[in-house]
Design a protein with these regions (language model features):
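Alpha-helical interaction segments
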Residues: 13-15, 77
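Short amphipathic
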Residues: 2-12
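Amphipathic, hydrophobic secondary-structure cores in small proteins
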Residues: 16-18, 22-26, 31-70
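C-terminal structural segments of small proteins and small subunits
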Residues: 58-91
């Protein structure tokens, strides 16, 4: 089984808030893979909006994403693109 980890900086103005978390979960659910997100030693499932909100990840914070499963690589790329695109919210 493939497992990948990557650190990403949250760059959108409002951080990992409700709408951004929902987009993150929607992205995870499109793939045959699992994702976990870690910040400051706290780890949550990438398919849990509430879990993502509990991380309290404002702009400028760093999260570690780990993906595993058959689609681990395309999921990691999709999540990297999502974060890099400001969760589709502009800057």
């Amino acid at each position: 089984m493939t497992e990948l980890s990557r650190e990403l900086r949250i760059i959108n103005e409002k951080g990992l808030h409700a709408r951004a978390s929902a987009r993150f979960v929607e992205t995870v659910e499109r793939f045959d893979a699992r994702a976990t997100v870690e910040k400051d030693g706290e780890r949550v499932a990438g398919d849990s909006i509430m879990g993502l909100l509990m991380l309290v990840a404002p702009r400028g914070s760093t999260i570690r994403i780990t993906t595993s499963g058959p689609d681990a690589e395309p999921l990691m790329q999709a999540l990297t693109d999502l974060v890099g695109d400001y969760f589709g919210e502009g800057r």
